[in-house]
Curated annotation (Swiss-Prot):
This is Homeobox protein abdominal-A homolog. SMART domains: HOX (SM00389). Gene3D superfamilies: Homeodomain-like. It is found in: Nucleus. InterPro entries: Abdominal-A (IPR022132), Antp_homeobox (IPR050296), HD (IPR001356), HD_metazoa (IPR020479), Homeobox_CS (IPR017970), Homeodomain-like_sf (IPR009057). Residues 6-65 bind DNA. Keywords: Developmental protein, DNA-binding, Homeobox, Nucleus. Its main location: nucleus. The keyword Disulfide bond does not apply. Residues 73-99, 119-139 are annotated as: Disordered. SUPFAM superfamilies: Homeodomain-like.
Amino acid sequence: PNGCPRRRGRQTYTRYQTLELEKEFHFNHYLTRRRRIEIAHALCLTERQIKIWFQNRRMKLKKELRAVKEINEQARKDREEQEHKIRSSSSDDGSIGKGVGIPLDASLLKSNDSQSVSLNHLTHKSPDGMMDKTPKSII
């Protein structure tokens, strides 16, 4: 009535469309225009819908990776705090606690970063013993 165009409602995708879009995203986070046209035609969606779905999916992935990083940082801080408590509660004779008599193992005090998920340094050895630096999935 006041001359403003009405905003479109939220797009809902069928399970099949979502599955196909997720499969494509698994292999490619970015689409060429040609591939976007192909997918739009195959799923009976517009190019714009495909483009926006991929933009939203990339933002979702970015948010998930940020959450994983925060969890790892918190785990590292918690581990360092525990190690500090162990160090400060150990007595002069190298045992943990008062009169417990359990020898303190120095290897327990070292940071164990292998429990953290590394986002940047996921490397694996290939069968020939060379390092393969291709990124591996963390999920």
